[in-house]
């Protein structure tokens, strides 16, 4: 049997896939070691969303190659840009994640199709409801790795969710490249029905819905918002990445939604949910983005005031149409990124500041630093409780807390 070391980069789906790799390796008798230098094989689960990440993956692969006897590379970069490792002189076996356990066992990467297995990580159950997406964004390399959407039946996903709850999951994380288009390849829009049925599973748990593009959510916005309002199991949290406040830029990105449609999604949730959390993403410095386009994005950010915002500077990804566009200068992108980041931080600071003095029920999700634990309230805002060990507080517990203070992106709470 082999010893292994595994490192994971990227999204929740990647982390879930790494947990499943580890489970299968343990079942096969392999054991994990703390560092690559003592491992028979190192496993690198990669991300490739932007150019800086790609460079980081190649650099880390070279380091691991020197530190361990054998290297297996998996994840999105392995699937979308597998040749990049060979071209960089990295001696590694490149596999889909579902192929890694066999590669560790017999030294070969078989050809299989990755599945969507659920994974339990502490009290968090990670449930990929589909793989792939329906979009064709001009800048995105991830689809080269994940392909077109493939949605398992609702009943199958509900069975997986039930298994996670029965195994001890207190938080279910519904994941996918785009959860909003679940079922679209079958001519149906199934996300709302799936969530309703998952919430009907007996047990005391919470459900977080992963990224759902405005394109998919817009057509079911009222139905989806009603499901959120009707089910207390659902965190009042929606991650809908708008990417730009300019319709012209959205068209060049091939995002398949416009700014008003994004606003209509936000309005539908505003009408039905008090104090819900909107998360979104913006790409700054897209090749065709003018100063006016950037100002439109800033205005939209200030208008909808999302509590979580991912701001990413555009970077060219190989094999995408946007890679052939004449880009903006690095200084321009940096200035626009800084301006948007400053605004988002001001919004978040205000949100968490307004929570001070309020009482909220939270779910303890995972250990924090020292003797603290990380908790989530009903809108998925993070509240840290200190001194958890001496109070007998552990992941999986539900607590009533009073918010006592805050940092920019989280609050502190005391049990009451």
Residue ranges and their predicted role:
Residues 120-123, 133-135, 234, 244, ...:
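Short flexible coil/turn linkers enriched for glycine and charged/polar residues
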Residues 71, 75, 80-81, 166-291:
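Conserved SAM/AdoMet-binding glycine-rich loop
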Residues 316, 324-416:
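Terminal RNA-binding accessory module
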Residues 1-182, 190, 234, 259-271, ...:
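Proteins enriched for Cys/Gly/acidic motifs involved in redox and nucleic-acid/cofactor modification
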Residues 11, 43, 76, 129, ...:
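Residue-level signature of catalytic and energy-coupling elements of molecular machines
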Residues 29-31, 35-37, 184-193, 369-371, ...:
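Short, glycine- and charge-enriched coil/turn segments that flank and shape catalytic ligand pockets
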Residues 203, 221-222, 229, 305-306, ...:
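Conserved N-terminal phosphate-binding loop of PLP-dependent enzymes in the Aspartate aminotransferase
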Residues 135, 147, 180, 247-248, ...:
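Glycine-centered loop/turn positions within well-structured domains
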């Amino acid at each position: 049997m082999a010893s292994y070391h595994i490192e994971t980069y990227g999204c929740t789906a990647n982390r879930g896939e790494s947990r499943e790799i580890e489970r299968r390796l343990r079942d096969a008798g392999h054991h994990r070691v703390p560092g690559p230098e003592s491992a028979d094989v190192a496993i690198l689960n990669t991300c490739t969303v932007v150019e800086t990440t790609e460079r980081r993956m190649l650099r880390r692969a070279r380091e691991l190659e020197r530190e361990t006897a054998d290297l297996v590379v998996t994840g999105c970069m392995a699937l979308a840009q597998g040749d990049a490792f060979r071209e960089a002189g990295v001696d590694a076996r490149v596999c889909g994640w579902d192929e890694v356990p066999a590669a560790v066992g017999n030294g070969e990467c078989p050809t299989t199709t990755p599945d969507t297995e659920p994974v339990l990580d502490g009290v968090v159950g990670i449930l990929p409801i589909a793989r792939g997406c329906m979009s064709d964004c001009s800048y995105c390399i991830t689809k080269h790795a994940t392909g077109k959407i493939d949605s398992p039946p609702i009943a199958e996903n509900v069975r997986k969710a039930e298994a996670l709850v029965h195994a001890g999951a207190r938080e279910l994380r519904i994941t996918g490249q785009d959860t909003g288009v679940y079922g679209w390849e079958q001519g149906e829009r199934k996300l709302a029905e799936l969530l309703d049925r998952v919430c009907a599973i007996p047990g005391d748990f919470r459900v977080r819905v992963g990224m759902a593009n405005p394109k998919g959510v817009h057509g079911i916005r009222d139905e989806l918002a009603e499901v959120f309002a009707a089910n207390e199991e659902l965190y009042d949290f929606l991650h809908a990445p708008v990417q730009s406040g300019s319709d012209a830029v959205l068209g060049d990105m091939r995002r398949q939604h416009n700014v008003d449609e994004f606003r209509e999604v936000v309005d539908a949730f505003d009408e039905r949910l008090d104090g819900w959390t909107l998360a979104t993403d913006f790409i700054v410095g897209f090749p065709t983005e003018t100063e006016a386009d950037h100002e439109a994005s800033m205005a939209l950010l200030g208008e909808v005031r999302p509590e979580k915002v991912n701001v990413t500077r555009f970077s060219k990804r190989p094999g995408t149409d946007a890679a052939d566009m004449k880009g903006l200068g690095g200084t321009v992108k940096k200035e626009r990124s800084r301006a948007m980041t400053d605004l988002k931080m001001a919004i978040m600071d205000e949100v968490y500041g307004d929570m001070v003095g309020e009482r909220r029920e939270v779910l303890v999700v995972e250990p924090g630093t020292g003797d603290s634990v990380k908790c989530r309230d009903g809108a998925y805002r993070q509240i840290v409780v200190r001194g958890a060990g001496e109070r007998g507080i552990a992941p999986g517990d539900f607590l009533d807390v009073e918010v006592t203070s805050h940092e920019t992106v989280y609050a502190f709470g005391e049990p009451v």
